[in-house]
């Protein structure tokens, strides 16, 4: 299996990856094909495909923020079972992030991720891909060290239509397992930057940010 970076919408691997995304994720979570042009060309956004016998069987997108020394996993797709794709993607992502933080002269503080709460949503099929079942994924991510940030979370739809997307928890995986809380300012700054690409945001999102500004720290809870 190969771990191949994708930097253009014209890459045939991206066509396959985008089709895989549409099979696996709900429509509001998938950015339109043409809108991927700038993100893929952005050196700070790292999109990799797991390629097996010419097919894209998995993919991951993540980014490193040197100013905060944190990372964000945008998504991880496991499109086929029985190939240890999840382990393959996580291992290669970790190696890449270790090198990026080394270049920054630091060790990674931690990594954010949005994780589905399957206990609060009805549709669990995710394109019928068994490894993508939200119940399974949530437990695996908990095993990896992710913890739930203690506040009710929503995010703007990637359709950029101003709708709020719920049914997820905003989570953080600290490099130091002893950490039980993080600065609210870090969360606010990160979310503001992360969703700055979307011009249409729901009022509920702005309200969430304002409520976070009233906090100094946000607790990390078991996932």
Positions of PLM-derived features:
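A conserved beta-turn-beta hairpin within the catalytic core of GNAT-like acetyltransferases
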Residues: 64-73, 81, 106-109
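Short amphipathic alpha-helix that is part of the acyltransferase structural core
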Residues: 1-35, 51, 56
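A short, internal acetyl-CoA/4′-phosphopantetheine-binding micro-motif in the GNAT/acyltransferase core
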Residues: 75-84, 117
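Conserved beta-strand in the GNAT
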Residues: 49, 55-63, 70-77
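Conserved acetyl-CoA-binding loop-helix of GNAT-fold acetyltransferases
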Residues: 82-99, 108
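A short helix-loop-beta-strand connector motif used in the catalytic cores of GNAT acetyltransferases and
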Residues: 38-49, 106, 163
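Terminal substrate-recognition subdomain of acyl/acetyltransferases
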Residues: 2, 6-9, 102-223
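Hydrophobic, well-ordered beta-alpha structural blocks that scaffold small-molecule cofactor pockets
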Residues: 59-61, 88, 99-103, 110-112
